[in-house]
Amino acid sequence: MARSPVLIINCKNYKEAAGGRIDSLAAAAAGAAAKYGVRIALAPPQHLLGAVKGEDLTVLAQHIDDKGVGSTTGYVVPELLGESGVSGALINHSEHRVSADQVASLVPRLRGLDMISVVCVKDSAEAANLSRHRPDYIAIEPPELIGSGRSVSSERPELIGEAAEAIRGADGTKLLCGAGITSGADVRKALELGSKGILVASGVVKSSDPAAAIAELAQAMS
Protein backbone atom coordinates (compact mmCIF):
# COMPACT_ATOMS: atom_id res chain seq x y z
CA MET A 1 0.00 0.00 0.00
CA ALA A 2 2.97 2.27 -0.60
CA ARG A 3 1.27 4.44 -3.21
CA SER A 4 0.14 7.79 -1.79
CA PRO A 5 -2.24 9.14 -0.87
CA VAL A 6 -4.28 6.45 0.82
CA LEU A 7 -7.82 6.44 2.20
CA ILE A 8 -8.50 3.95 5.00
CA ILE A 9 -12.13 3.36 5.93
CA ASN A 10 -12.59 1.91 9.41
CA CYS A 11 -16.05 0.36 9.62
CA LYS A 12 -15.73 -0.18 13.39
CA ASN A 13 -18.70 -2.23 14.63
CA TYR A 14 -21.26 0.09 13.09
CA LYS A 15 -24.53 -1.58 12.19
CA GLU A 16 -24.34 0.26 8.86
CA ALA A 17 -21.53 -2.15 7.92
CA ALA A 18 -23.35 -5.30 9.05
CA GLY A 19 -24.47 -8.14 6.85
CA GLY A 20 -24.80 -7.41 3.16
CA ARG A 21 -24.18 -3.73 3.69
CA ILE A 22 -20.44 -4.40 3.80
CA ASP A 23 -20.71 -5.55 0.18
CA SER A 24 -22.12 -2.17 -0.86
CA LEU A 25 -19.36 -0.33 1.01
CA ALA A 26 -16.68 -2.50 -0.57
CA ALA A 27 -18.10 -2.03 -4.06
CA ALA A 28 -18.29 1.75 -3.60
CA ALA A 29 -14.72 1.87 -2.32
CA ALA A 30 -13.39 -0.27 -5.18
CA GLY A 31 -15.23 1.88 -7.71
CA ALA A 32 -13.86 5.11 -6.28
CA ALA A 33 -10.33 3.70 -6.14
CA ALA A 34 -10.48 2.79 -9.82
CA LYS A 35 -12.10 6.06 -10.90
CA TYR A 36 -9.83 8.44 -9.00
CA GLY A 37 -6.61 6.43 -8.96
CA VAL A 38 -6.17 6.42 -5.20
CA ARG A 39 -5.45 3.53 -2.86
CA ILE A 40 -8.42 2.67 -0.63
CA ALA A 41 -8.27 0.22 2.25
CA LEU A 42 -11.28 -1.13 4.10
CA ALA A 43 -11.22 -2.32 7.72
CA PRO A 44 -14.50 -4.20 8.18
CA PRO A 45 -15.77 -5.65 11.44
CA GLN A 46 -13.51 -8.58 12.29
CA HIS A 47 -16.09 -11.26 11.52
CA LEU A 48 -16.60 -9.80 8.02
CA LEU A 49 -12.95 -9.73 6.95
CA GLY A 50 -13.51 -12.65 4.59
CA ALA A 51 -16.54 -11.01 3.02
CA VAL A 52 -14.47 -8.34 1.25
CA LYS A 53 -11.19 -10.09 0.50
CA GLY A 54 -12.27 -10.80 -3.07
CA GLU A 55 -12.78 -7.13 -3.88
CA ASP A 56 -10.09 -5.02 -5.56
CA LEU A 57 -9.27 -3.41 -2.23
CA THR A 58 -6.68 -3.54 0.49
CA VAL A 59 -8.29 -5.24 3.49
CA LEU A 60 -7.10 -4.42 7.00
CA ALA A 61 -8.04 -5.87 10.37
CA GLN A 62 -9.23 -3.36 12.94
CA HIS A 63 -7.06 -4.92 15.65
CA ILE A 64 -4.53 -7.69 16.17
CA ASP A 65 -3.28 -9.40 19.30
CA ASP A 66 0.27 -10.19 20.28
CA LYS A 67 -0.49 -13.89 20.49
CA GLY A 68 0.76 -16.84 18.51
CA VAL A 69 -0.71 -19.49 16.28
CA GLY A 70 -2.13 -22.40 18.23
CA SER A 71 -4.05 -22.56 21.50
CA THR A 72 -5.01 -18.89 21.67
CA THR A 73 -8.79 -18.98 21.58
CA GLY A 74 -10.49 -15.71 20.70
CA TYR A 75 -7.35 -13.76 19.82
CA VAL A 76 -6.70 -12.20 16.41
CA VAL A 77 -3.42 -13.67 15.19
CA PRO A 78 -1.45 -11.90 12.43
CA GLU A 79 -0.21 -15.08 10.76
CA LEU A 80 -3.72 -16.43 10.31
CA LEU A 81 -4.93 -13.10 8.94
CA GLY A 82 -2.18 -13.21 6.34
CA GLU A 83 -3.10 -16.77 5.40
CA SER A 84 -6.68 -15.56 4.90
CA GLY A 85 -5.76 -12.78 2.47
CA VAL A 86 -5.85 -9.85 4.88
CA SER A 87 -3.17 -7.28 4.03
CA GLY A 88 -2.48 -5.75 7.44
CA ALA A 89 -3.98 -4.19 10.53
CA LEU A 90 -4.69 -1.14 12.59
CA ILE A 91 -2.79 -1.16 15.88
CA ASN A 92 -3.50 0.92 18.99
CA HIS A 93 -6.70 2.60 17.83
CA SER A 94 -8.02 4.93 20.53
CA GLU A 95 -10.96 2.57 21.08
CA HIS A 96 -8.68 -0.47 21.45
CA ARG A 97 -5.35 0.72 22.75
CA VAL A 98 -2.43 -1.59 23.44
CA SER A 99 0.82 -1.15 25.30
CA ALA A 100 3.95 0.32 23.74
CA ASP A 101 5.60 -3.07 24.21
CA GLN A 102 2.87 -4.71 22.14
CA VAL A 103 3.35 -2.15 19.37
CA ALA A 104 7.08 -2.87 19.48
CA SER A 105 6.34 -6.57 19.00
CA LEU A 106 3.51 -6.35 16.47
CA VAL A 107 5.01 -3.92 13.95
CA PRO A 108 8.09 -6.03 13.09
CA ARG A 109 5.93 -9.13 13.19
CA LEU A 110 3.69 -7.70 10.48
CA ARG A 111 6.74 -6.55 8.54
CA GLY A 112 8.11 -10.08 8.59
CA LEU A 113 4.82 -11.30 7.15
CA ASP A 114 4.90 -8.60 4.44
CA MET A 115 1.77 -7.08 5.97
CA ILE A 116 0.85 -3.43 6.51
CA SER A 117 1.01 -1.80 9.93
CA VAL A 118 -1.07 1.30 10.72
CA VAL A 119 -0.26 2.52 14.22
CA CYS A 120 -2.75 5.00 15.66
CA VAL A 121 -1.55 7.71 18.04
CA LYS A 122 -3.25 10.43 20.06
CA ASP A 123 -0.58 13.14 19.86
CA SER A 124 2.83 14.02 18.43
CA ALA A 125 4.68 12.69 21.48
CA GLU A 126 3.18 9.25 20.99
CA ALA A 127 3.90 9.55 17.27
CA ALA A 128 7.58 10.16 17.99
CA ASN A 129 7.75 7.27 20.44
CA LEU A 130 5.97 4.63 18.36
CA SER A 131 7.42 5.65 14.99
CA ARG A 132 10.76 4.28 16.23
CA HIS A 133 9.45 0.85 15.27
CA ARG A 134 9.03 2.01 11.66
CA PRO A 135 5.42 1.09 10.98
CA ASP A 136 4.17 1.68 7.46
CA TYR A 137 1.84 4.39 8.72
CA ILE A 138 1.34 6.51 11.80
CA ALA A 139 -2.25 7.79 12.05
CA ILE A 140 -2.71 10.85 14.25
CA GLU A 141 -6.20 10.97 15.79
CA PRO A 142 -6.98 13.27 18.73
CA PRO A 143 -9.52 11.20 20.72
CA GLU A 144 -11.75 14.17 21.45
CA LEU A 145 -12.39 14.70 17.73
CA ILE A 146 -13.13 11.10 16.75
CA GLY A 147 -16.72 10.85 15.53
CA SER A 148 -17.31 14.51 16.31
CA GLY A 149 -17.74 15.80 12.77
CA ARG A 150 -15.05 18.37 13.62
CA SER A 151 -11.92 17.54 11.65
CA VAL A 152 -8.39 17.54 12.96
CA SER A 153 -7.32 19.51 9.88
CA SER A 154 -9.60 22.40 10.83
CA GLU A 155 -9.70 22.16 14.63
CA ARG A 156 -6.08 21.12 15.33
CA PRO A 157 -4.12 21.82 12.12
CA GLU A 158 -0.89 22.37 14.01
CA LEU A 159 -1.02 18.77 15.23
CA ILE A 160 -0.56 17.42 11.71
CA GLY A 161 2.62 19.44 11.19
CA GLU A 162 3.91 18.46 14.63
CA ALA A 163 3.27 14.78 13.93
CA ALA A 164 4.94 15.00 10.51
CA GLU A 165 8.02 16.45 12.18
CA ALA A 166 7.88 13.86 14.97
CA ILE A 167 8.11 10.92 12.56
CA ARG A 168 10.63 12.48 10.17
CA GLY A 169 13.41 10.20 11.35
CA ALA A 170 11.38 7.01 10.87
CA ASP A 171 12.52 5.76 7.48
CA GLY A 172 9.59 4.72 5.31
CA THR A 173 6.84 5.68 7.78
CA LYS A 174 4.07 7.85 6.32
CA LEU A 175 1.65 10.08 8.21
CA LEU A 176 -2.11 9.69 8.07
CA CYS A 177 -4.61 11.86 9.86
CA GLY A 178 -8.05 11.02 11.15
CA ALA A 179 -10.75 12.18 13.54
CA GLY A 180 -13.75 14.11 12.29
CA ILE A 181 -12.87 13.96 8.59
CA THR A 182 -16.12 14.35 6.64
CA SER A 183 -15.46 16.37 3.48
CA GLY A 184 -13.17 16.86 0.54
CA ALA A 185 -12.12 20.19 2.02
CA ASP A 186 -10.97 18.39 5.18
CA VAL A 187 -8.90 16.01 3.05
CA ARG A 188 -7.28 18.72 0.95
CA LYS A 189 -6.31 20.68 4.05
CA ALA A 190 -4.80 17.59 5.68
CA LEU A 191 -2.72 16.83 2.59
CA GLU A 192 -1.53 20.44 2.42
CA LEU A 193 -0.37 20.17 6.04
CA GLY A 194 1.76 17.10 5.35
CA SER A 195 -0.53 14.08 5.72
CA LYS A 196 -0.10 11.30 3.16
CA GLY A 197 -3.62 10.00 3.59
CA ILE A 198 -6.74 9.80 5.70
CA LEU A 199 -8.25 7.41 8.24
CA VAL A 200 -12.02 7.85 8.34
CA ALA A 201 -14.93 6.01 9.95
CA SER A 202 -18.32 7.56 10.72
CA GLY A 203 -17.87 10.25 8.06
CA VAL A 204 -18.30 7.49 5.49
CA VAL A 205 -19.95 4.50 7.13
CA LYS A 206 -22.69 6.44 8.92
CA SER A 207 -23.23 8.88 6.06
CA SER A 208 -26.67 8.99 4.46
CA ASP A 209 -24.90 8.19 1.17
CA PRO A 210 -21.66 6.28 1.84
CA ALA A 211 -20.83 5.89 -1.85
CA ALA A 212 -21.02 9.64 -2.40
CA ALA A 213 -18.96 10.26 0.75
CA ILE A 214 -16.23 7.89 -0.44
CA ALA A 215 -16.22 9.50 -3.88
CA GLU A 216 -15.87 13.00 -2.42
CA LEU A 217 -12.92 12.02 -0.24
CA ALA A 218 -11.22 10.05 -3.01
CA GLN A 219 -11.66 12.83 -5.54
CA ALA A 220 -10.02 15.28 -3.13
CA MET A 221 -6.97 13.01 -3.09
CA SER A 222 -6.69 12.61 -6.85
Swiss-Prot record:
Keywords: Cytoplasm, Gluconeogenesis, Glycolysis, Isomerase. Pathway: Carbohydrate biosynthesis; gluconeogenesis; Carbohydrate degradation; glycolysis; D-glyceraldehyde 3-phosphate from glycerone phosphate: step 1/1. It catalyses: D-glyceraldehyde 3-phosphate = dihydroxyacetone phosphate. GO terms for cellular component: cytoplasm. Its EC number is 5.3.1.1. Coiled coil: none annotated. The active site is at H93, E141. InterPro entries: Aldolase_TIM, TIM_sf, Triosephosphate_isomerase, Triosephosphate_isomerase_arc. Substrate binds at N10, C11, K12, I146, G180, A201, S202. GO terms for molecular function: triose-phosphate isomerase activity. It is found in: Cytoplasm. One of its GO terms (biological process) is gluconeogenesis. It is an enzyme of class 5 (isomerase). Its main location: cytoplasm. HAMAP family: TIM_A. Belongs to the triosephosphate isomerase family. Homotetramer; dimer of dimers. Involved in the gluconeogenesis. Catalyzes stereospecifically the conversion of dihydroxyacetone phosphate (DHAP) to D-glyceraldehyde-3-phosphate (G3P). This is Triosephosphate isomerase. It comes from Cenarchaeum symbiosum (strain A).
